Amino acid sequence: MSGMLGLSAVMGKRPKQQVTARPRKCPIEKPEEIPDDLLIDVFSRLSIEDVARCRCLSRFWSSILRRRYFTELFHKMSSTRPRILFTFLYYGKRLFYSMPQDLDPSNHYSPLPYFSISYSPISAHYQMHFPKVLGASAKVCPPILGLICCKSSKTMIFNPSTRESKFISTTKRVGVKSTSFGYDPIDKLFKVLSMSDDFVCRVSTLGTEVVTWRTVECSVPHHPLHSEICMDGVLYYLARRVGDETPKPYMVAAFEVRLERFKFLPMDLRCKHIGCSAVIDYKGKLAVVWLNVDRDNQRHIESFELRVLNDVDEVKWSQIIYELPNYWNNLPADIDVSIVGMTSAGEIVLATSHIRHPFYIFYYSTVTLAIVQLRIDFGIEAPEANHCSTMSTFVNHVENVELACGLGLSSIAM
């Protein structure tokens, strides 16, 4: 028997191995692709930071996030959560900060009737800065659809949401007196209006392959002043007629962005009011608002006075006055405030005019006549007196996800 086993071994026979049958693979079902419309709806609800991350995760996602439909939908969603934008020069750099515009009902305010003070400062969110090497801007136009126009050594367009900026080639003529920013909602075009020292007006359209400047006819030579707003395709700004030495040389210039033509709206605005006045959106109508102060004490604010434009064709203004309570003037003596705009809830917003500590903003409700005072913390040290620059504060700022390439201009990442 042993011989047989040995022979079997020599002949190379192997013992039988038990083979286990492999289970059949179940067919793998591929997940259904998510419809583009659903992706766009989800992306539109993300924060601007999350949208930026999604651009980097997938080329397909990035292509979706560049679509015009998504940009417009995100703007629509962002309009429901407007922000207040702050910008100022800080040792040569222009800084941008923002904060939610709507008051937080959970915040703890003092229980004074009709006058509330926030006990804790609100931290503003840092957005971007304007490099010192590019020059400092003296003029900052109000944001339109999240974009900001600044005039420095060159005119620049900023998008604080994407932290991009773009140069715009200036006119060949030197000595630009002023720069304004407008938007045409029909053709969906941004335009820059420029006025030279010889009062010649020119306009340029963003997004074109070659930036060109066109001369615009202007029948009334004028000096543009400090306040402007773009509403329904019309750029409004306060102005003073050149050579007019009458007590009322002021008016509102109205530039129709799409048709590129001027109209001038005379109004009753005196010299003593011009420094504390502003053009605002009052319930969908253009209005000019200013502060009435006590003759004996210029720091004592008595009321807000508004002129509301009821008829553009016949230039008819109506007057509204909101009297301020006496406790409004129980503020620190060194606070110098200016009107910065009006919210959709009917609140006139004022802010400290210069960057200093503490920095305040105020909400005055034209509905309840209540006042809320907030202290804002920018997380920086107070600048020295000779570096205490003017603060530009804007209401109704919305975030814009459009990248520089969408405007057809080269960008500088911040």
UniProtKB/Swiss-Prot annotation:
It comes from the Eukaryota. Pfam families: F-box (PF00646), FBA_3 (PF08268). Gene3D superfamilies: 1.20.1280.50. Residues 1-24 are annotated as: Disordered. Residues 28-77 form the F-box domain. NCBIfam families: F_box_assoc_1. This is F-box protein At3g47030.
